[in-house]
Design a protein with these regions (language model features):
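Short Lys/Arg-enriched helix C-cap and helix-to-coil transition segments
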Residues: 144-166, 174-175, 183, 196-197
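Short, amphipathic alpha-helical "recognition" segments used to contact nucleic acids or chromatin
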Residues: 98-115
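Polybasic, low-complexity binding patches
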Residues: 45, 49-52, 69-103
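Major-groove recognition helix of helix-turn-helix-like DNA-binding domains
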Residues: 129-143
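Immediate flanking context of iron-sulfur cluster ligation sites
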Residues: 12-27, 33-62, 73-76
């Protein structure tokens, strides 16, 4: 239900038409299917049945996987996105450490520059000021701020880490089917990256 979030406090990382074109295909964008957008933001999501009207719309949505992916990447605090309410999304991320970072890395992969600093990477992948990505970056480089030649190689290493985590996760029972399909489609963009078993 991202159509109502344009211009909100959420930090949408990639606003290109190619990336956001799926929104026009969303079931929630059709007033005949979803006349009242407020159903996607029930006052008490933990109350039994509160999210069922929204989930029924998501169940027939052709882009539910895209919606859920972006909600996980952006860590949407409220609402039903891609068929999952916010408590369900939080639980999903808590069960798989590193999943939010890996999904975000894949989401912004085509924006990662060749020349990159530790701070650039943290800003690009996680958001300015966040320390969540630093352990990943520190695999090869201590935090310094000096520009590193071969940032492309660093990008590939980061992508391999993200792909390994996400591929394993989508093959398990924990990944919602619409998101698994969407992630598999996205992974096809990276055939040159070797994913270890």
């Amino acid at each position: 239900m991202f159509n109502d979030l344009k211009g909100s406090k959420m930090n949408v990382l990639d606003r290109s038409k190619r990336r956001q074109a799926w929104r026009s295909s969303a079931a929630c964008a059709d007033p005949e299917i979803s006349p009242d957008r407020r159903v996607f933001f029930p006052p008490n999501e933990t109350q039994p049945g509160a999210c069922e009207p929204a989930k029924s719309v998501c169940a027939q949505c052709p882009v539910a996987g895209d919606c859920l992916w972006l909600a996980l990447v952006e860590r949407a605090a409220d609402g039903v996105f891609g068929g999952l309410a916010s408590p369900e999304r939080r639980h999903l991320l808590e069960r798989t450490p590193g999943l939010a970072i890996a999904l975000r890395v894949i989401y912004v992969a085509d924006q990662l520059p060749e020349w990159i600093t530790h701070q650039d990477m943290a800003t690009m992948c996680i958001g300015a000021g966040s320390k969540q990505l630093r352990p990943v970056w520190a695999i090869r480089h201590p935090p310094s701020g000096d520009r590193v030649r071969g940032g492309r190689w660093i990008k590939d290493e980061l992508m391999a880490w993200a792909l390994n985590l996400v591929v394993g996760w989508t093959q398990g029972d924990d990944c919602p089917p619409p998101l698994a399909d969407r992630v598999r489609h996205e992974l096809a963009r990276f055939p040159q990256t070797v994913v270890c078993a």
